[in-house]
Amino acid sequence: MAMQFYASPEQIMRDRSELARKGIARGRSAVVLSYAGGVLFVAENLSSALHKVGEIYDRIGFAAVGRYNEFENLRRAGVRMADLNGLSYDRRDVTGRALANAFAQTLGAIFTEQSKPFEVEICVAQVGATTADDELYRLTYDGSVNDEPGRMAMGGQAEAITGVLKSNHRPDMSLGDAVKVAVQALGSVGGEGGAARTIAADQLEVAVLDRGRVGRTFRRVTGAALTVLLDDGAAGQPPSSSDTDTSAAEARKPTASAGSADLEGPEPERPDS
């Protein structure tokens, strides 16, 4: 009869943690931070079809690193939960904290009960009336939840990126300055010999939760609008309304369709596909 090997619970948990950390470290990093106009998401993403940043509800956004199929399943479950609670009770009852707790319970159960943990790290962000009211929650593969102070980085080199963010981030920054700080932080790691990298616009996925919008606040920043934000000549200046949105009046209107709320680019009237 074959002898069965014994592994202590501590060793099993260490092995699962190591597996999850290695999987997360293989992916590209993402940054989430508060700025004067809302909450900014910036992720390195070479794919135009698979999004690492997305919308969950009116004032709640989602960003993740790791295995796409795993964190996308979590995001979809969060959308269904938020929609159900909003329809059953009130839209104001849907909060980022409640969603973060639900994600934490799911991740914790998978980590302890399944043979393989999810190789993901997640941020749930909720935009508030002011930067002090913004909420950023970090969730790790084992279900741990941390409330982050207005800025956070995810991925294998999150500690080094967070150090750059801590040095340069200010809550009163314009959108243009916030994008530059986020891209600078992402590019500070991964270069040859420890040198900084230059990240092109087509390698970035950028989105915001716009504090000034009513209803759905999530919108993507793409194309010419993103190029303007990354342009060195526009340093220290917020993007013009023609580049970032149709008009200030349009920004104050409630958004009812995914096309009007989800995409920002050179042709705002075109629905997001």
Curated annotation (Swiss-Prot):
Disulfide-bonded cysteines: none
SUPFAM superfamilies in alphabetical order: N-terminal nucleophile aminohydrolases (Ntn hydrolases)
Coiled-coil blocks: none
Record keywords: Cytoplasm, Proteasome
Domain of life of the native organism: Bacteria
GO terms for MF: threonine-type endopeptidase activity
Reported regulation of activity: The formation of the proteasomal ATPase ARC-20S proteasome complex, likely via the docking of the C-termini of ARC into the intersubunit pockets in the alpha-rings, may trigger opening of the gate for substrate entry. Interconversion between the open-gate and close-gate conformations leads to a dynamic regulation of the 20S proteasome proteolysis activity.
UniProt-annotated stretches for the region Disordered: 231-273
This protein's name: Proteasome subunit alpha
Subunit annotation: The 20S proteasome core is composed of 14 alpha and 14 beta subunits that assemble into four stacked heptameric rings, resulting in a barrel-shaped structure. The two inner rings, each composed of seven catalytic beta subunits, are sandwiched by two outer rings, each composed of seven alpha subunits. The catalytic chamber with the active sites is on the inside of the barrel. Has a gated structure, the ends of the cylinder being occluded by the N-termini of the alpha-subunits. Is capped by the proteasome-associated ATPase, ARC.
One GO process term, biological-process aspect: proteasomal protein catabolic process
Species this protein is from: Salinispora arenicola (strain CNS-205)
InterPro entries noted in UniProt: Ntn_hydrolases_N, Proteasome_alpha, Proteasome_alpha-type, Proteasome_asu_bac, Proteasome_sua/b
PROSITE patterns found in the cross-reference section: PROTEASOME_ALPHA_2 (PS51475)
Entry keyword annotation includes Cytoplasm: yes
Compartments it resides in: Cytoplasm
Family of the protein in this entry: Belongs to the peptidase T1A family.
Known function: Component of the proteasome core, a large protease complex with broad specificity involved in protein degradation.
Pathway: Protein degradation; proteasomal Pup-dependent pathway
GO cellular component, one term: proteasome core complex, alpha-subunit complex
GN (gene name): prcA
Low complexity: compositionally biased ranges: 238-249
